[in-house]
Amino acid sequence: MRLSTFFISSLAVATSAAPTWPSLQLNDIGDPLGALSAVSQYFNLVADKVSAVKTMRGSPKCDLSKAEMPTVPGLPPPAPGSKLRHVAVGRGTQNYTCDGSADSKPKAVGAVATLFNVTCMAAMYPEVTNKVSNMAVHFDLDAANRVGPATLPVSGHHYFTAAGVPFFDIGDEGQIPCAKNASADAPDTSTIGRTGERAIPWLRLLATKDATKGLGEVFRVSTAGGSPPATCKDRTGPFQVEYSAEYWFWSK
């Protein structure tokens, strides 16, 4: 598979559109300097890659065997023999609820996110991919299904079923209901959320029997924001915390 004209143009559009859309509301962000740094790092890398592509004699190859998933101590690798199928950046909310007691801890009740296709980006330009999640969490959730200023195609959606099962629908690539197999704290250097929330843990999720297209595992890595407050003080009932993350899908 070779790099498509669409992918190159997507990077170029993201760079040219930055001054006008979308706006970055620094007054609403707990760490404005960190937000500006994350966004500027993303655009600088995009500009470098667009310039490099324009001077290449041929197109770089989208070889998924070359992609290297981020790792963190304590999180097991994919099962031996697994093959990478898809990589997406998820942008959405982690959902929690409080029972009315100020001293109790918020209870996790699921998540909702739109998934944006960064598969070839992860294979060819991993340093750019790693900046997308860090950048995206600082921009408003958008009804037009855009991940901040990046013009990335939507590859699917993530949500929890009525039975509380994590579910990923990535279109033609398949559907994967799954269950948590392992968890590891996000690195201390992870991007915080818009109002200072710590990054949610990295996860390994294993498919249940109803998964399709041979999908076997999902990894949540490179997380930004999403963690709840330590207690339910001043909170009652359901609430949401915005987050972004990379999701890596592996087949058996």
Listing of model-derived features with the role each one plays in the protein:
Residues 1-23:
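Fungal secretory targeting signals
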Residues 21-94, 102-252:
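Primary mode marks residue(s) on the alpha4-beta5-alpha5 output face of response regulator receiver
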